[in-house]
Amino acid sequence: NQNGYVFGAIYNKKMEVVHYGTNKKEEIQLFRGSKYVQSKIGHTYQEAKKLLQTGCLVCFSGTPCQIAGLKNYLKKDYANLITVDLVCRGNPSPLLFRKYLEYQQIKYKNKVTGVKFRDKYYGYNYSTMTLDFEDERIQYHYGMEADLMLKFFFKGLCSKPACHQCVFKSIERVSDFTIFDCWNAKFYNKIMDKAGATHVFIHSQKGFDYFEYLKSYFVYQKSNVQKVVEQDGCMMLQSAIPSTRRADFFRDLNNLPFDRLQAKYFPLTLMRKIIIKMKPFFYHIGIFSIYMKLKKML
């Protein structure tokens, strides 16, 4: 409503993750959703600076290192700049993501038109990788036990080396806001539904002022910082832990077809095949939530 610009990570037409700026409300949705890939900053720092110098309001979102990079590039504080970082596990390789998409398109004989790394198809407590294809009849909703991109990421095989000794792992940040998942929303507010909730840390007076201005648009509850970090914020303080096989994995990534990578690093055992089939079945017969509760108990 103030003719401002928002910058953040989106998928371009080539399904690459890139930073992009817009002042169009209908494009804001492009920034939604987790993207477990290192985004290309491109010329967005320069574009943001030009807008700031004209007095335009700018909101720039990204990983902590990207926000620090922006601040370093600008060399000064701007009253009309709002920065938002997120708690990230690490920045996976764009090369891996490109090869993953190529593999899926060959496997399904169809073009991928959309990617959701953390889709809520089965609800907030079990997010999946969802792929959209040109042929809308193709359904792809798989969690870490079946999806290779998620598997490689969460097993520490594909994040860049700097993520393993991240200098931005701290509660205090250079940004105005830090956002991350609130996995234990039910302990804070009973009305939270299966769509989930987000923690918001405010680091500056500017951030506080904007939060006060916007808070009537959403449901919120104040929380204790240390309690939140203990329950949901371990990645705020801990760097990604690399797999001992990471170096081998990247050598193989450049030389082996994607299906050979799966066979070498995560062979499809009979038990994995059973688990992959069980979850969609439980969901369709209406007992998936019961299955997830039993899994947590075990």
Segment roles from a protein language model:
Residues 17-46:
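Glycine-rich phosphate-binding "P-loop"
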Residues 1-14, 21:
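Low-complexity, highly charged intrinsically disordered N-terminal segments
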